[in-house]
Amino acid sequence: LLAFALVSEPVFNLAHYEQWTGPALQNVLFTLSLSCLELFVLARIESDAAERGKRIALYVLTCLVFGAAAFAVRSEYVFLGTLSAALFYLLRSAGVWRLAGLLPLLIASPWVLLCAPLLLLYSGERGRRGGKYFFYFFYPAHFLLLQLLGKWIATALA
């Protein structure tokens, strides 16, 4: 996942900043990489820490550490992305309350609400494996296509 984040970064920067290196945010695959690692740590805490108080303290500490890491690498959504991932994980069996994972992302974009119905439909079971890597290749490809389309339109209008 981190390899896809690194490969996608120059094209992401080109699309957002019109240069190969971007001074501001990194692409969302960095957020996803950090979030996956965070969920691994949260799962270990869940299975290893029997005492509820200790588990909660470790959950909070994990969220703070990964939030700081997201801030340090300037991942997209910064600490809000990793916090949302943690909330989705920790509230995964809480029914409609799992939508609380959207709250941090609402600060960044109200469009996040559009995914709420999809989240409510999720059964908790892993989907088909086919096409998994398609989206990792599509992510940088769509930035490149949009950049080329923008250049073509700008040239046509000039």
Where do the language-model regions lie?
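Alpha-helical transmembrane segments and their immediate juxtamembrane cytosolic regions
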Residues: 1-158
